[in-house]
Amino acid sequence: MAQTVPGSDDAAVAATGVDGEVAVASTVAEERVSVASQWQLMWWRFRKHKLAMVGAIVVILFYVAVVFADFLAYADPEVSDAQRGLIAPQAIVWFDPDTGSFFPHVPGLVGKRDPLTFKRVYAVDPSVKVPVQFFAEGFEYKMFGFIPMNRHLIGVEGGNAEESIFLLGTDIQGRDMWSRLMYATRISLTIGLVSVAVSLVLGVVLGGLSGYFGGWTDTVVQRVIEILRSIPTIPLWMGLAAAVPQDWSVLQVYFVITIIISLIGWTELARVVRGRFLSLREEDFVMAAELSGCNQARIIFIHMVPLFLSHIIAATTLALPAMIISETSLSFLGLGMRPPAISWGVLLQQAQNVQTVAISPWLLLPAVPVIIVILAFNFLGDGLRDAADPYN
């Protein structure tokens, strides 16, 4: 006579219920994936890449600083004062040490002459507290290029060399390093962005023409690519940058340096685009578009390029760090942006003197955002590349 184990039916029902829920959940997930667009699938894969998400947040924060550089800078980056040269960085003290109340301030500075070098040096005077104001008034600027403003994130009222705030210290000419770093971030990151945009256009157009038409067009484009890639990049950039006249304006030099950096960057993307076009031009939808009377430009840019647009985005994101490094290197060597222009490379020019760096190590601080941005873009590019890979 068969015995019934108490609770066995309930356990079986519960197990069946759990399996059913798992099966339903699996079916729903599969159905969701089957109806998702390419961009949705990319986003789902991308957000699983934690380092890429961190890199994306860092990049967004830096470009927010690019847009609001004037607001974040509390001092005019061009105003110099020999009386406050090479002041060490100051830290904001958030609470009053005497009362314990919230009172953001920086300790005052006392200037005196060094009896050995006869240079003016500054010492901290804890008895003097310089209040730090948020949304303080300062030098005038134009937000977004057309809105006149004079408000800044932080600042102090008036003040002289002994009563001012210098978050990252000052350079040898007494210019505030924090404010100059904000403006340098704007120049360096926009040069990289514009250079990548130019490389993107050249790479897609020339690579697309090479792969779609083939024949002598493909031969000419590929030979040009091989010639450009056979020339050492740094000497080529240095030679072209050295040919820029010294009397050109900052805007003229900006666009010339952008073009010089873009000169080599488009070749790798052009080869990738050419390879994809060689495989796509034999597809049925291309033949259908040709038979329906579509012109060749429409076939290339409307029908073929969108099929691997995600790969192009990933490739351009990975190319951005190289562009930024190129501009910084050229400017550091004195062949890129030149004073009065402000870029990361221009700021690092003062760090070429070992003796100056030994006395004022904060002059090396502009190298920190360079490292952070390069790492962030590399993580972001890796995440986009993996997300754009349908076999990943």
Q: Where are each of the predicted segments found?
A:
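Gly/Trp-centered helix-boundary motif
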Residues: 1-200, 204, 340-341, 351-380, ...
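Alpha-helical transmembrane segments of integral membrane proteins
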Residues: 170-392
